[in-house]
Amino acid sequence: MAEKFDHLEEHLEKFVENIRQLGIIVSDFQPSSQAGLNQKLNFIVTGLQDIDKCRQQLHDITVPLEVFEYIDQGRNPQLYTKECLERALAKNEQVKGKIDTMKKFKSLLIQGLSKVFPEDMAKYRSIRGEDHLPS
């Protein structure tokens, strides 16, 4: 899988370098540099074709739009992953707290019902396969 990304990264680096060189040629254009300009334009077209060929290998990869927003804002896209993990951890802790509360409530409810309806709760525990009161 990383091989696909390495291949794309290589093509993107070449493309960016050709764009940089094209910018240098264009910023100080002389009629004598027309051949070099044409060559760079051809390299850019070829580079775009190479990048497009990589697309077929990566068609199943999706990138959240928020990552592009981070990049547009000049932020590190890895911060997006970090913040997603932090949100997931916080949500996980919140859900764990709810689960623990529900387990405690169930235990207290069964204890209370066992005191008020001991025979019915004995039947309930036998149906559930529980031999004892939960603590």
UniProtKB/Swiss-Prot annotation:
Cellular localization per UniProt: Nucleus
A matching Pfam family: Med10
Keywords: Activator, Nucleus, Transcription, Transcription regulation
Disulfide bond sites: none
Main location: nucleus
GO biological process: regulation of transcription by RNA polymerase II
GO terms under cellular component: mediator complex
UniProt subunit comment: Component of the Mediator complex, which is composed of MED1, MED4, MED6, MED7, MED8, MED9, MED10, MED11, MED12, MED13, MED13L, MED14, MED15, MED16, MED17, MED18, MED19, MED20, MED21, MED22, MED23, MED24, MED25, MED26, MED27, MED29, MED30, MED31, CCNC, CDK8 and CDC2L6/CDK11. The MED12, MED13, CCNC and CDK8 subunits form a distinct module termed the CDK8 module. Mediator containing the CDK8 module is less active than Mediator lacking this module in supporting transcriptional activation.
Its job: Component of the Mediator complex, a coactivator involved in the regulated transcription of nearly all RNA polymerase II-dependent genes. Mediator functions as a bridge to convey information from gene-specific regulatory proteins to the basal RNA polymerase II transcription machinery. Mediator is recruited to promoters by direct interactions with regulatory proteins and serves as a scaffold for the assembly of a functional preinitiation complex with RNA polymerase II and the general transcription factors.
Similarity annotation: Belongs to the Mediator complex subunit 10 family.
Listed name of the protein: Mediator of RNA polymerase II transcription subunit 10
Source organism of the structure: Macaca fascicularis (Crab-eating macaque)
